[in-house]
């Protein structure tokens, strides 16, 4: 279930941006999070408001972000394939409930993930 869409939004969470550069997909705590495509994990760890975050570089200027995880199952530098589990859903960082903050960065600019799914 998508609980927050890409773009401007009203949020009651202190410290949360009013421009959302991703979509939020909600499910139960611990739900498996899978890589949208194959690539190399360039970041796997804690990053402020994102909480536990995984970033995958897919090449050609294309990266995906997976934030607010409860735990991570991949490490920086690891090669992953499309559909491989990379994390477990949670509510870490600046978050109001269990969800995956899913973002797509193309050539340094976040784009609406719904245009690519």
Segments predicted by a language model, with ranges:
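Catalytic cores of peptidoglycan-degrading enzymes
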Residues: 1-117
